[in-house]
Amino acid sequence: MNFVYLVVLCPLVSFCLLLFFIDYLPKMLVKKIGIVSIFISMIITFYSLFDFLNCGKQCVFYIPLWVWISIDYLKIDFNFMLDGLSITMLTMTTSIGFLIHLFSSWYIKLQDEYTRFFSYMNLFIASMVLLLLADNLLVMYIGWEGVGLCSYLLVGFYYSKINSGYAAIKGFIITRIGDIFLILAIFFIYKNFGTLNFRELKLIFETTNVVENFKFLNYVSLFLLIAAIAKSAQVPLQTWLIDAMAGPTPASALIHSSTMVTAGVYLIARMNFLFSLSPIILYILGIISCLTIIMSCLSALVQKNIKCILAYSTMGQVGYMFLALAMKEWTLAINHLVTHAIFKTLLFLSAGAVIILLNNEKNIFNMGGLRKKFPMLYFSFLIGGASLASFPILTSGFYSKGNILFSALENNYYLFLVLGLLGSVLTSIYTFRMIFLVFCGAQKYRAHYVFFSRTLANTLPLLILILLSTVIFVLIHLPLSSVFSKTTPSFLINNNKLLFEIGCSVLSLLGMFISYYLFLVNRMLVDLLLNTKLGNFIYNFWYDSWGFNSLYNILCVNPYLYVAKRLKHDPINIFMSIPITFCFFVSKNLKYIHNGYLRVYVFSIMFGLFLFILMAIRLYK
Protein backbone atom coordinates (compact mmCIF):
# COMPACT_ATOMS: atom_id res chain seq x y z
CA MET A 1 0.00 0.00 0.00
CA ASN A 2 2.96 2.32 0.58
CA PHE A 3 3.80 2.13 -3.13
CA VAL A 4 0.50 3.59 -4.28
CA TYR A 5 2.21 6.88 -5.14
CA LEU A 6 3.85 4.99 -8.03
CA VAL A 7 0.43 4.82 -9.67
CA VAL A 8 0.78 8.57 -10.26
CA LEU A 9 4.54 8.62 -10.70
CA CYS A 10 4.83 6.00 -13.48
CA PRO A 11 2.66 7.75 -16.09
CA LEU A 12 4.07 11.12 -15.00
CA VAL A 13 7.67 9.97 -15.53
CA SER A 14 6.78 8.41 -18.88
CA PHE A 15 5.16 11.70 -19.91
CA CYS A 16 8.38 13.56 -19.11
CA LEU A 17 10.52 11.05 -21.00
CA LEU A 18 8.31 11.16 -24.08
CA LEU A 19 8.09 14.94 -23.99
CA PHE A 20 11.79 15.65 -23.53
CA PHE A 21 12.93 13.10 -26.13
CA ILE A 22 10.04 13.57 -28.54
CA ASP A 23 12.30 13.82 -31.60
CA TYR A 24 14.72 11.04 -30.70
CA LEU A 25 12.71 7.99 -29.65
CA PRO A 26 11.66 5.36 -32.22
CA LYS A 27 8.00 4.38 -32.39
CA MET A 28 8.54 0.95 -30.88
CA LEU A 29 10.24 2.42 -27.81
CA VAL A 30 7.56 5.12 -27.51
CA LYS A 31 4.89 2.43 -27.50
CA LYS A 32 6.69 0.42 -24.85
CA ILE A 33 7.25 3.42 -22.58
CA GLY A 34 3.65 4.60 -22.92
CA ILE A 35 1.97 1.24 -22.43
CA VAL A 36 4.32 -0.30 -19.85
CA SER A 37 4.03 2.70 -17.53
CA ILE A 38 0.23 2.38 -17.45
CA PHE A 39 0.54 -1.39 -17.08
CA ILE A 40 2.76 -0.94 -14.00
CA SER A 41 0.24 1.51 -12.54
CA MET A 42 -2.51 -1.03 -13.15
CA ILE A 43 -0.57 -3.84 -11.45
CA ILE A 44 0.15 -1.66 -8.41
CA THR A 45 -3.53 -0.71 -8.30
CA PHE A 46 -4.63 -4.35 -8.31
CA TYR A 47 -2.12 -5.14 -5.59
CA SER A 48 -3.50 -2.26 -3.53
CA LEU A 49 -7.04 -3.46 -4.21
CA PHE A 50 -6.31 -6.97 -2.93
CA ASP A 51 -4.53 -5.51 0.08
CA PHE A 52 -7.51 -3.25 0.72
CA LEU A 53 -10.02 -6.11 0.48
CA ASN A 54 -7.96 -8.32 2.79
CA CYS A 55 -7.97 -5.61 5.45
CA GLY A 56 -11.74 -5.32 5.35
CA LYS A 57 -14.02 -2.97 3.49
CA GLN A 58 -14.13 -0.55 6.43
CA CYS A 59 -10.42 0.24 6.11
CA VAL A 60 -9.13 3.61 5.00
CA PHE A 61 -5.44 3.98 4.18
CA TYR A 62 -3.55 7.27 4.40
CA ILE A 63 -0.25 7.65 2.59
CA PRO A 64 1.65 10.71 3.92
CA LEU A 65 4.02 12.29 1.42
CA TRP A 66 5.06 15.82 2.41
CA VAL A 67 3.84 19.11 3.84
CA TRP A 68 2.93 21.22 0.85
CA ILE A 69 1.95 24.58 2.41
CA SER A 70 2.75 25.72 5.95
CA ILE A 71 2.12 29.42 6.64
CA ASP A 72 1.02 30.35 10.16
CA TYR A 73 -2.30 28.56 10.68
CA LEU A 74 -2.54 27.44 7.05
CA LYS A 75 -1.22 23.91 6.64
CA ILE A 76 -1.93 21.79 3.57
CA ASP A 77 -0.45 18.30 3.35
CA PHE A 78 0.23 16.58 0.05
CA ASN A 79 -1.06 13.16 1.06
CA PHE A 80 -2.99 10.33 -0.56
CA MET A 81 -6.10 8.59 0.75
CA LEU A 82 -7.27 5.15 -0.29
CA ASP A 83 -10.82 4.18 0.63
CA GLY A 84 -13.55 2.21 -1.10
CA LEU A 85 -14.46 5.03 -3.46
CA SER A 86 -10.94 5.95 -4.52
CA ILE A 87 -9.80 2.32 -4.98
CA THR A 88 -12.88 1.61 -7.12
CA MET A 89 -12.29 4.62 -9.34
CA LEU A 90 -8.54 4.00 -9.41
CA THR A 91 -8.98 0.41 -10.57
CA MET A 92 -11.37 1.54 -13.29
CA THR A 93 -9.10 4.35 -14.51
CA THR A 94 -5.87 2.36 -14.71
CA SER A 95 -7.49 -0.77 -16.17
CA ILE A 96 -9.45 1.01 -18.88
CA GLY A 97 -6.53 3.36 -19.46
CA PHE A 98 -4.27 0.38 -20.12
CA LEU A 99 -6.75 -1.18 -22.58
CA ILE A 100 -7.11 2.13 -24.42
CA HIS A 101 -3.33 2.54 -24.57
CA LEU A 102 -2.97 -0.96 -25.96
CA PHE A 103 -5.60 -0.29 -28.61
CA SER A 104 -4.06 3.11 -29.40
CA SER A 105 -0.76 1.49 -30.34
CA TRP A 106 -2.61 -0.03 -33.31
CA TYR A 107 -4.97 2.86 -34.02
CA ILE A 108 -2.41 5.66 -34.25
CA LYS A 109 0.61 3.74 -35.52
CA LEU A 110 0.50 5.32 -38.99
CA GLN A 111 0.34 8.91 -37.72
CA ASP A 112 3.34 11.20 -37.36
CA GLU A 113 2.59 12.57 -33.89
CA TYR A 114 2.91 9.16 -32.24
CA THR A 115 5.09 10.32 -29.35
CA ARG A 116 3.06 13.43 -28.60
CA PHE A 117 -0.14 11.39 -28.43
CA PHE A 118 1.19 8.93 -25.85
CA SER A 119 2.76 11.70 -23.77
CA TYR A 120 -0.59 13.51 -23.53
CA MET A 121 -2.47 10.31 -22.73
CA ASN A 122 -0.06 9.41 -19.93
CA LEU A 123 -0.31 12.89 -18.42
CA PHE A 124 -4.09 12.55 -18.64
CA ILE A 125 -4.11 9.36 -16.59
CA ALA A 126 -1.57 10.75 -14.10
CA SER A 127 -3.80 13.80 -13.54
CA MET A 128 -6.91 11.68 -13.06
CA VAL A 129 -5.13 9.37 -10.62
CA LEU A 130 -3.96 12.39 -8.62
CA LEU A 131 -7.55 13.66 -8.53
CA LEU A 132 -8.77 10.31 -7.21
CA LEU A 133 -6.07 9.76 -4.59
CA ALA A 134 -6.03 13.27 -3.11
CA ASP A 135 -7.02 13.46 0.55
CA ASN A 136 -7.96 17.15 0.38
CA LEU A 137 -9.68 19.53 -1.99
CA LEU A 138 -6.61 21.56 -2.93
CA VAL A 139 -4.55 18.56 -4.06
CA MET A 140 -7.62 17.28 -5.89
CA TYR A 141 -7.84 20.65 -7.63
CA ILE A 142 -4.41 20.08 -9.17
CA GLY A 143 -5.64 16.86 -10.74
CA TRP A 144 -8.88 18.60 -11.70
CA GLU A 145 -6.97 21.26 -13.62
CA GLY A 146 -4.66 18.60 -15.05
CA VAL A 147 -7.46 16.63 -16.71
CA GLY A 148 -8.84 19.89 -18.11
CA LEU A 149 -5.46 20.74 -19.61
CA CYS A 150 -5.00 17.26 -21.09
CA SER A 151 -8.48 17.33 -22.56
CA TYR A 152 -7.55 20.59 -24.29
CA LEU A 153 -4.32 19.07 -25.63
CA LEU A 154 -5.99 15.90 -26.92
CA VAL A 155 -9.06 17.58 -28.42
CA GLY A 156 -6.72 19.93 -30.27
CA PHE A 157 -4.33 17.11 -31.16
CA TYR A 158 -4.81 17.69 -34.90
CA TYR A 159 -3.85 21.33 -34.50
CA SER A 160 -3.37 21.85 -38.24
CA LYS A 161 -7.16 21.59 -38.61
CA ILE A 162 -8.78 24.86 -37.60
CA ASN A 163 -11.91 23.13 -36.24
CA SER A 164 -9.79 21.10 -33.81
CA GLY A 165 -8.25 24.27 -32.43
CA TYR A 166 -11.63 25.92 -31.99
CA ALA A 167 -13.04 22.80 -30.31
CA ALA A 168 -10.12 22.64 -27.88
CA ILE A 169 -10.47 26.32 -26.94
CA LYS A 170 -14.24 26.00 -26.55
CA GLY A 171 -13.95 23.02 -24.22
CA PHE A 172 -11.21 24.66 -22.20
CA ILE A 173 -13.17 27.90 -21.71
CA ILE A 174 -16.48 26.25 -20.77
CA THR A 175 -14.88 23.89 -18.26
CA ARG A 176 -12.94 26.86 -16.90
CA ILE A 177 -16.28 28.27 -15.72
CA GLY A 178 -16.65 25.25 -13.48
CA ASP A 179 -13.04 25.53 -12.33
CA ILE A 180 -13.68 29.08 -11.09
CA PHE A 181 -16.64 27.96 -9.02
CA LEU A 182 -14.67 25.02 -7.62
CA ILE A 183 -11.87 27.25 -6.36
CA LEU A 184 -14.47 29.62 -4.86
CA ALA A 185 -16.03 26.67 -3.03
CA ILE A 186 -12.58 25.67 -1.75
CA PHE A 187 -11.99 29.20 -0.39
CA PHE A 188 -15.38 29.29 1.34
CA ILE A 189 -14.94 25.84 2.86
CA TYR A 190 -11.52 26.69 4.29
CA LYS A 191 -12.73 30.06 5.60
CA ASN A 192 -15.62 28.49 7.52
CA PHE A 193 -14.16 25.15 8.60
CA GLY A 194 -10.40 25.74 8.65
CA THR A 195 -9.57 22.55 6.74
CA LEU A 196 -9.77 21.06 3.26
CA ASN A 197 -9.14 17.47 4.30
CA PHE A 198 -11.99 15.14 3.31
CA ARG A 199 -11.80 13.09 6.50
CA GLU A 200 -11.80 16.15 8.76
CA LEU A 201 -14.63 17.80 6.82
CA LYS A 202 -16.74 14.66 7.06
CA LEU A 203 -16.10 14.49 10.80
CA ILE A 204 -17.14 18.14 11.19
CA PHE A 205 -20.36 17.60 9.26
CA GLU A 206 -21.22 14.47 11.23
CA THR A 207 -20.42 15.72 14.73
CA THR A 208 -21.35 19.42 14.71
CA ASN A 209 -24.51 21.32 13.93
CA VAL A 210 -23.55 22.92 10.62
CA VAL A 211 -27.18 23.12 9.48
CA GLU A 212 -27.46 26.45 11.30
CA ASN A 213 -25.49 28.02 8.45
CA PHE A 214 -28.02 26.83 5.90
CA LYS A 215 -27.42 29.51 3.26
CA PHE A 216 -23.68 28.94 3.32
CA LEU A 217 -24.13 25.21 2.72
CA ASN A 218 -26.41 25.92 -0.23
CA TYR A 219 -23.94 28.39 -1.74
CA VAL A 220 -21.00 26.00 -1.45
CA SER A 221 -23.08 23.08 -2.75
CA LEU A 222 -24.21 25.22 -5.69
CA PHE A 223 -20.62 26.16 -6.53
CA LEU A 224 -19.56 22.51 -6.43
CA LEU A 225 -22.58 21.59 -8.55
CA ILE A 226 -21.63 24.12 -11.24
CA ALA A 227 -18.08 22.76 -11.24
CA ALA A 228 -19.42 19.22 -11.64
CA ILE A 229 -21.87 19.93 -14.46
CA ALA A 230 -19.23 21.88 -16.40
CA LYS A 231 -16.73 19.04 -16.13
CA SER A 232 -19.29 16.32 -16.82
CA ALA A 233 -21.01 18.17 -19.70
CA GLN A 234 -24.49 18.55 -18.27
CA VAL A 235 -27.09 21.16 -19.25
CA PRO A 236 -26.46 24.07 -19.70
CA LEU A 237 -22.66 23.66 -19.95
CA GLN A 238 -22.73 20.65 -22.26
CA THR A 239 -21.91 22.16 -25.65
CA TRP A 240 -18.17 21.49 -25.47
CA LEU A 241 -18.51 17.71 -25.38
CA ILE A 242 -19.74 17.32 -28.97
CA ASP A 243 -16.95 19.51 -30.34
CA ALA A 244 -14.48 17.43 -28.32
CA MET A 245 -14.98 14.66 -30.88
CA ALA A 246 -12.40 16.47 -33.02
CA GLY A 247 -9.64 14.57 -31.19
CA PRO A 248 -8.43 11.02 -31.84
CA THR A 249 -11.02 8.34 -31.05
CA PRO A 250 -8.96 6.60 -28.31
CA ALA A 251 -8.61 9.98 -26.61
CA SER A 252 -12.39 10.40 -26.84
CA ALA A 253 -12.77 6.98 -25.25
CA LEU A 254 -10.54 8.00 -22.34
CA ILE A 255 -12.30 11.36 -21.88
CA HIS A 256 -15.78 9.84 -21.91
CA SER A 257 -15.19 6.66 -19.95
CA SER A 258 -12.86 7.07 -17.01
CA THR A 259 -11.35 10.54 -16.73
CA MET A 260 -12.67 13.98 -17.64
CA VAL A 261 -16.43 13.40 -17.80
CA THR A 262 -16.55 11.24 -14.68
CA ALA A 263 -14.65 13.77 -12.55
CA GLY A 264 -17.82 15.74 -11.80
CA VAL A 265 -19.62 12.64 -10.57
CA TYR A 266 -16.67 11.77 -8.36
CA LEU A 267 -16.59 15.29 -6.90
CA ILE A 268 -20.22 15.14 -5.75
CA ALA A 269 -19.85 11.57 -4.49
CA ARG A 270 -16.74 12.52 -2.52
CA MET A 271 -18.52 15.53 -0.99
CA ASN A 272 -21.72 13.56 -0.31
CA PHE A 273 -21.76 14.62 3.35
CA LEU A 274 -22.14 18.25 2.21
CA PHE A 275 -24.78 17.63 -0.47
CA SER A 276 -26.83 15.50 1.94
CA LEU A 277 -27.53 18.69 3.90
CA SER A 278 -28.60 20.64 0.79
CA PRO A 279 -31.86 19.07 -0.45
CA ILE A 280 -32.66 22.09 -2.62
CA ILE A 281 -29.39 21.74 -4.52
CA LEU A 282 -29.96 18.00 -4.90
CA TYR A 283 -33.40 18.63 -6.37
CA ILE A 284 -31.89 21.13 -8.82
CA LEU A 285 -29.34 18.46 -9.68
CA GLY A 286 -32.17 16.02 -10.37
CA ILE A 287 -33.92 18.47 -12.71
CA ILE A 288 -30.66 19.17 -14.56
CA SER A 289 -29.96 15.46 -14.95
CA CYS A 290 -33.44 14.73 -16.35
CA LEU A 291 -33.20 17.61 -18.81
CA THR A 292 -29.79 16.38 -19.91
CA ILE A 293 -31.07 12.83 -20.40
CA ILE A 294 -34.01 13.86 -22.61
CA MET A 295 -32.16 16.53 -24.58
CA SER A 296 -29.14 14.34 -25.27
CA CYS A 297 -31.30 11.41 -26.39
CA LEU A 298 -33.32 13.53 -28.81
CA SER A 299 -30.16 15.13 -30.20
CA ALA A 300 -28.57 11.71 -30.68
CA LEU A 301 -31.60 10.64 -32.73
CA VAL A 302 -30.75 13.08 -35.53
CA GLN A 303 -26.95 12.87 -35.60
CA LYS A 304 -25.07 11.44 -38.57
CA ASN A 305 -21.57 11.37 -37.09
CA ILE A 306 -21.00 8.11 -35.21
CA LYS A 307 -18.75 9.80 -32.63
CA CYS A 308 -21.29 12.56 -31.99
CA ILE A 309 -23.95 9.93 -31.29
CA LEU A 310 -21.66 8.32 -28.73
CA ALA A 311 -20.90 11.74 -27.24
CA TYR A 312 -24.59 12.47 -26.72
CA SER A 313 -25.01 9.01 -25.22
CA THR A 314 -22.30 9.88 -22.70
CA MET A 315 -24.21 13.01 -21.71
CA GLY A 316 -27.34 10.94 -21.17
CA GLN A 317 -25.67 8.20 -19.15
CA VAL A 318 -23.84 10.71 -16.95
CA GLY A 319 -27.28 12.26 -16.50
CA TYR A 320 -28.44 8.98 -14.95
CA MET A 321 -25.44 9.09 -12.61
CA PHE A 322 -26.37 12.60 -11.52
CA LEU A 323 -29.97 11.46 -11.10
CA ALA A 324 -28.77 8.80 -8.66
CA LEU A 325 -26.71 11.40 -6.81
CA ALA A 326 -29.74 13.68 -6.60
CA MET A 327 -31.62 10.88 -4.80
CA LYS A 328 -28.65 10.29 -2.44
CA GLU A 329 -28.03 6.90 -4.05
CA TRP A 330 -24.27 7.37 -4.06
CA THR A 331 -23.46 3.69 -4.54
CA LEU A 332 -25.80 3.33 -7.51
CA ALA A 333 -24.20 6.36 -9.16
CA ILE A 334 -20.68 4.94 -8.86
CA ASN A 335 -21.87 1.50 -9.95
CA HIS A 336 -23.38 2.94 -13.12
CA LEU A 337 -20.26 5.06 -13.62
CA VAL A 338 -18.03 1.99 -13.68
CA THR A 339 -20.50 0.02 -15.80
CA HIS A 340 -20.78 2.88 -18.27
CA ALA A 341 -17.01 3.28 -18.44
CA ILE A 342 -16.67 -0.30 -19.63
CA PHE A 343 -19.30 -0.41 -22.37
CA LYS A 344 -18.60 3.15 -23.51
CA THR A 345 -14.92 2.31 -23.98
CA LEU A 346 -16.00 -0.75 -25.96
CA LEU A 347 -18.24 1.40 -28.18
CA PHE A 348 -15.62 4.07 -28.80
CA LEU A 349 -12.86 1.60 -29.60
CA SER A 350 -15.16 -0.31 -31.95
CA ALA A 351 -16.25 2.94 -33.59
CA GLY A 352 -12.62 3.98 -33.91
CA ALA A 353 -11.78 0.73 -35.67
CA VAL A 354 -14.71 1.23 -38.07
CA ILE A 355 -13.62 4.80 -38.80
CA ILE A 356 -10.01 3.93 -39.51
CA LEU A 357 -10.98 0.92 -41.63
CA LEU A 358 -13.28 3.08 -43.77
CA ASN A 359 -10.62 5.71 -44.42
CA ASN A 360 -11.86 8.11 -41.73
CA GLU A 361 -15.53 7.89 -42.73
CA LYS A 362 -17.75 8.93 -39.79
CA ASN A 363 -21.16 9.38 -41.42
CA ILE A 364 -23.32 6.40 -40.49
CA PHE A 365 -25.42 6.90 -43.63
CA ASN A 366 -22.34 6.20 -45.75
CA MET A 367 -21.81 2.86 -44.02
CA GLY A 368 -23.96 -0.26 -43.96
CA GLY A 369 -23.53 -4.02 -44.24
CA LEU A 370 -20.32 -4.06 -42.21
CA ARG A 371 -21.34 -7.05 -40.10
CA LYS A 372 -20.40 -9.38 -42.94
CA LYS A 373 -17.05 -7.75 -43.52
CA PHE A 374 -16.08 -7.24 -39.87
CA PRO A 375 -18.00 -9.72 -37.67
CA MET A 376 -15.70 -9.10 -34.70
CA LEU A 377 -16.40 -5.37 -34.71
CA TYR A 378 -20.10 -6.02 -35.23
CA PHE A 379 -20.25 -8.31 -32.21
CA SER A 380 -18.33 -5.90 -29.97
CA PHE A 381 -20.47 -2.96 -31.09
CA LEU A 382 -23.63 -4.99 -30.58
CA ILE A 383 -22.70 -5.95 -27.01
CA GLY A 384 -21.66 -2.40 -26.13
CA GLY A 385 -24.78 -0.94 -27.72
CA ALA A 386 -27.02 -3.48 -26.00
CA SER A 387 -25.55 -2.54 -22.64
CA LEU A 388 -26.03 1.15 -23.45
CA ALA A 389 -29.66 0.47 -24.38
CA SER A 390 -30.18 -1.62 -21.20
CA PHE A 391 -30.97 -4.79 -23.11
CA PRO A 392 -32.64 -7.08 -20.54
CA ILE A 393 -30.99 -9.83 -18.53
CA LEU A 394 -27.79 -10.19 -20.53
CA THR A 395 -26.11 -6.79 -20.15
CA SER A 396 -24.60 -4.97 -17.20
CA GLY A 397 -26.22 -1.66 -18.16
CA PHE A 398 -29.67 -3.15 -17.64
CA TYR A 399 -29.01 -3.68 -13.93
CA SER A 400 -27.05 -0.51 -13.14
CA LYS A 401 -29.54 1.81 -14.85
CA GLY A 402 -32.54 -0.23 -13.67
CA ASN A 403 -31.50 0.15 -10.04
CA ILE A 404 -31.37 3.94 -10.43
CA LEU A 405 -34.84 4.08 -11.97
CA PHE A 406 -36.30 1.73 -9.38
CA SER A 407 -34.83 3.92 -6.65
CA ALA A 408 -36.80 6.82 -8.13
CA LEU A 409 -39.95 4.70 -7.86
CA GLU A 410 -39.20 3.60 -4.30
CA ASN A 411 -38.45 7.14 -3.13
CA ASN A 412 -41.51 8.66 -4.87
CA TYR A 413 -39.56 10.72 -7.39
CA TYR A 414 -42.21 10.14 -10.02
CA LEU A 415 -41.13 12.99 -12.30
CA PHE A 416 -37.58 11.66 -12.34
CA LEU A 417 -38.91 8.16 -12.95
CA VAL A 418 -41.06 9.10 -15.96
CA LEU A 419 -38.31 11.15 -17.59
CA GLY A 420 -35.75 8.45 -16.85
CA LEU A 421 -37.93 5.76 -18.45
CA LEU A 422 -38.56 7.99 -21.46
CA GLY A 423 -34.82 8.49 -21.78
CA SER A 424 -34.33 4.73 -21.63
CA VAL A 425 -36.69 4.20 -24.59
CA LEU A 426 -35.03 6.97 -26.60
CA THR A 427 -31.59 5.55 -25.79
CA SER A 428 -32.64 2.19 -27.17
CA ILE A 429 -33.98 3.83 -30.34
CA TYR A 430 -30.89 5.86 -31.21
CA THR A 431 -28.49 3.09 -30.19
CA PHE A 432 -30.03 0.47 -32.45
CA ARG A 433 -30.49 3.11 -35.17
CA MET A 434 -26.73 3.47 -35.14
CA ILE A 435 -26.16 -0.29 -35.13
CA PHE A 436 -28.65 -0.97 -37.93
CA LEU A 437 -27.33 1.79 -40.20
CA VAL A 438 -23.68 0.89 -39.69
CA PHE A 439 -23.72 -2.89 -39.71
CA CYS A 440 -27.00 -3.98 -41.33
CA GLY A 441 -28.74 -3.35 -44.64
CA ALA A 442 -27.06 -2.73 -47.96
CA GLN A 443 -23.44 -1.70 -48.28
CA LYS A 444 -23.30 2.06 -48.82
CA TYR A 445 -19.70 2.85 -48.09
CA ARG A 446 -17.84 4.93 -50.64
CA ALA A 447 -14.33 4.50 -49.34
CA HIS A 448 -12.35 1.34 -49.92
CA TYR A 449 -11.76 -0.93 -46.98
CA VAL A 450 -8.41 -0.91 -45.29
CA PHE A 451 -7.13 -4.37 -44.48
CA PHE A 452 -8.03 -5.31 -40.90
CA SER A 453 -5.31 -7.47 -39.41
CA ARG A 454 -6.20 -8.98 -36.06
CA THR A 455 -3.47 -8.30 -33.55
CA LEU A 456 -3.23 -8.47 -29.79
CA ALA A 457 -3.48 -4.68 -29.62
CA ASN A 458 -6.80 -4.34 -31.42
CA THR A 459 -8.43 -7.60 -30.31
CA LEU A 460 -7.60 -8.21 -26.64
CA PRO A 461 -9.07 -4.91 -25.35
CA LEU A 462 -12.33 -5.57 -27.21
CA LEU A 463 -12.62 -9.13 -25.89
CA ILE A 464 -12.06 -8.07 -22.28
CA LEU A 465 -14.56 -5.22 -22.57
CA ILE A 466 -17.13 -7.48 -24.24
CA LEU A 467 -16.90 -9.88 -21.32
CA LEU A 468 -17.28 -7.14 -18.71
CA SER A 469 -20.19 -5.50 -20.56
CA THR A 470 -22.34 -8.56 -19.96
CA VAL A 471 -24.14 -9.79 -16.86
CA ILE A 472 -20.81 -11.13 -15.56
CA PHE A 473 -19.91 -7.67 -14.26
CA VAL A 474 -23.02 -7.68 -12.05
CA LEU A 475 -21.35 -10.40 -9.96
CA ILE A 476 -18.58 -7.96 -8.98
CA HIS A 477 -19.39 -6.06 -5.77
CA LEU A 478 -17.76 -2.67 -5.43
CA PRO A 479 -16.12 -1.97 -2.02
CA LEU A 480 -18.14 1.14 -1.16
CA SER A 481 -19.60 0.18 2.20
CA SER A 482 -16.99 2.17 4.15
CA VAL A 483 -17.70 5.36 2.21
CA PHE A 484 -21.47 5.62 1.91
CA SER A 485 -23.86 4.82 4.71
CA LYS A 486 -26.56 3.80 2.25
CA THR A 487 -24.91 1.09 0.18
CA THR A 488 -27.38 -1.79 0.08
CA PRO A 489 -30.79 -0.56 -1.06
CA SER A 490 -33.76 -2.26 0.52
CA PHE A 491 -35.41 -2.76 -2.84
CA LEU A 492 -32.92 -5.45 -3.80
CA ILE A 493 -35.20 -7.92 -2.03
CA ASN A 494 -38.42 -6.15 -2.99
CA ASN A 495 -40.84 -8.35 -4.92
CA ASN A 496 -41.98 -5.34 -6.95
CA LYS A 497 -38.53 -5.08 -8.47
CA LEU A 498 -39.18 -8.11 -10.67
CA LEU A 499 -42.24 -6.45 -12.17
CA PHE A 500 -40.30 -3.24 -12.64
CA GLU A 501 -37.49 -5.07 -14.44
CA ILE A 502 -40.04 -6.68 -16.75
CA GLY A 503 -41.43 -3.24 -17.53
CA CYS A 504 -37.95 -1.87 -18.24
CA SER A 505 -37.25 -4.86 -20.47
CA VAL A 506 -40.41 -4.17 -22.47
CA LEU A 507 -39.42 -0.52 -22.93
CA SER A 508 -35.92 -1.42 -24.07
CA LEU A 509 -37.22 -3.97 -26.57
CA LEU A 510 -39.88 -1.50 -27.71
CA GLY A 511 -37.19 1.03 -28.54
CA MET A 512 -35.25 -1.59 -30.48
CA PHE A 513 -38.31 -2.59 -32.55
CA ILE A 514 -39.20 1.06 -33.23
CA SER A 515 -35.65 1.63 -34.47
CA TYR A 516 -35.80 -1.52 -36.60
CA TYR A 517 -39.07 -0.45 -38.21
CA LEU A 518 -38.08 3.17 -38.87
CA PHE A 519 -34.54 2.65 -40.11
CA LEU A 520 -34.58 -0.77 -41.75
CA VAL A 521 -38.16 -1.59 -42.74
CA ASN A 522 -39.83 1.75 -43.50
CA ARG A 523 -37.22 4.48 -44.03
CA MET A 524 -39.69 6.42 -46.17
CA LEU A 525 -41.69 7.36 -43.07
CA VAL A 526 -38.68 9.12 -41.55
CA ASP A 527 -37.94 10.92 -44.82
CA LEU A 528 -41.59 11.98 -45.06
CA LEU A 529 -41.48 13.50 -41.58
CA LEU A 530 -38.24 15.34 -42.29
CA ASN A 531 -39.62 16.85 -45.48
CA THR A 532 -42.31 18.76 -43.57
CA LYS A 533 -41.57 22.27 -42.26
CA LEU A 534 -42.17 21.27 -38.67
CA GLY A 535 -40.09 18.11 -39.02
CA ASN A 536 -37.23 19.99 -40.64
CA PHE A 537 -37.33 22.68 -37.93
CA ILE A 538 -37.28 20.10 -35.12
CA TYR A 539 -34.49 18.19 -36.85
CA ASN A 540 -32.27 21.27 -37.14
CA PHE A 541 -33.14 22.38 -33.60
CA TRP A 542 -32.13 19.04 -32.10
CA TYR A 543 -29.12 18.76 -34.39
CA ASP A 544 -27.82 22.14 -33.19
CA SER A 545 -27.87 21.01 -29.56
CA TRP A 546 -31.22 22.69 -28.87
CA GLY A 547 -29.95 26.09 -29.89
CA PHE A 548 -27.43 26.37 -27.04
CA ASN A 549 -24.59 27.15 -29.42
CA SER A 550 -26.58 29.95 -31.06
CA LEU A 551 -27.64 31.27 -27.65
CA TYR A 552 -24.08 31.38 -26.37
CA ASN A 553 -22.96 33.06 -29.58
CA ILE A 554 -25.54 35.81 -29.01
CA LEU A 555 -24.95 36.23 -25.28
CA CYS A 556 -21.20 35.69 -25.01
CA VAL A 557 -19.26 35.29 -28.24
CA ASN A 558 -20.68 38.17 -30.29
CA PRO A 559 -20.39 40.78 -27.47
CA TYR A 560 -16.83 39.64 -26.85
CA LEU A 561 -15.96 39.96 -30.55
CA TYR A 562 -17.56 43.41 -30.65
CA VAL A 563 -15.52 44.63 -27.68
CA ALA A 564 -12.36 43.02 -29.08
CA LYS A 565 -12.93 44.76 -32.42
CA ARG A 566 -13.32 48.10 -30.69
CA LEU A 567 -10.23 47.54 -28.56
CA LYS A 568 -8.24 46.64 -31.64
CA HIS A 569 -7.46 50.36 -32.17
CA ASP A 570 -6.95 50.96 -28.44
CA PRO A 571 -9.44 53.76 -27.57
CA ILE A 572 -7.48 54.46 -24.37
CA ASN A 573 -4.93 56.22 -26.56
CA ILE A 574 -7.53 58.94 -27.20
CA PHE A 575 -7.58 59.84 -23.50
CA MET A 576 -3.84 59.48 -23.12
CA SER A 577 -3.26 61.97 -25.96
CA ILE A 578 -5.12 64.80 -24.14
CA PRO A 579 -2.19 65.73 -21.79
CA ILE A 580 0.20 65.57 -24.71
CA THR A 581 -2.01 67.88 -26.79
CA PHE A 582 -2.25 70.33 -23.86
CA CYS A 583 1.53 70.41 -23.47
CA PHE A 584 1.96 71.11 -27.17
CA PHE A 585 -0.60 73.94 -26.94
CA VAL A 586 1.13 75.58 -23.97
CA SER A 587 4.54 75.20 -25.57
CA LYS A 588 3.33 76.69 -28.84
CA ASN A 589 1.98 79.81 -27.09
CA LEU A 590 4.92 80.26 -24.73
CA LYS A 591 7.39 80.44 -27.58
CA TYR A 592 5.99 83.82 -28.62
CA ILE A 593 7.35 85.33 -25.37
CA HIS A 594 10.91 84.46 -26.37
CA ASN A 595 11.04 86.61 -29.50
CA GLY A 596 14.47 88.29 -29.03
CA TYR A 597 13.18 91.90 -28.44
CA LEU A 598 14.85 93.66 -25.44
CA ARG A 599 11.80 95.82 -24.68
CA VAL A 600 9.66 92.74 -24.21
CA TYR A 601 12.14 91.23 -21.74
CA VAL A 602 12.37 94.55 -19.74
CA PHE A 603 8.59 94.82 -19.66
CA SER A 604 8.27 91.24 -18.45
CA ILE A 605 10.82 91.84 -15.66
CA MET A 606 9.13 95.04 -14.51
CA PHE A 607 5.68 93.46 -14.64
CA GLY A 608 6.86 90.49 -12.62
CA LEU A 609 8.57 92.74 -10.07
CA PHE A 610 5.37 94.78 -9.74
CA LEU A 611 3.33 91.64 -9.05
CA PHE A 612 5.92 90.49 -6.49
CA ILE A 613 5.72 93.84 -4.60
CA LEU A 614 1.91 93.69 -4.53
CA MET A 615 1.99 90.18 -3.08
CA ALA A 616 4.56 91.22 -0.44
CA ILE A 617 2.45 94.23 0.67
CA ARG A 618 -0.65 92.04 0.87
CA LEU A 619 1.14 89.47 3.00
CA TYR A 620 2.59 92.20 5.30
CA LYS A 621 -0.86 93.67 6.01
Curated annotation (Swiss-Prot):
Q: Which UniProt keywords apply?
A: Cell membrane, Membrane, NAD, Quinone, Translocase, Transmembrane, Transmembrane helix
Give the multimer and partner information.
Answer: Composed of 13 different subunits. Subunits NuoA, H, J, K, L, M, N constitute the membrane sector of the complex.
Catalytic reaction annotation: a quinone + NADH + 5 H(+)(in) = a quinol + NAD(+) + 4 H(+)(out)
- A Pfam family that this protein carries is Proton_antipo_N
Q: Which GO terms describe its biological process?
A: ATP synthesis coupled electron transport; electron transport coupled proton transport
- EC assignment: the record states 7.1.1.-
- Answer whether the UniProt record assigns the keyword Chloroplast to this protein: no
Which protein, by its recorded name, is this?
A: NADH-quinone oxidoreductase subunit L
Show the InterPro entries listed in the entry: NADHpl_OxRdtase_5_subgr, ND/Mrp_TM, NU5C-like, Proton_antipo_N
This protein's gene is called nuoL
Q: Which family does it belong to?
A: Belongs to the complex I subunit 5 family.
Q: Where located? A: Cell membrane
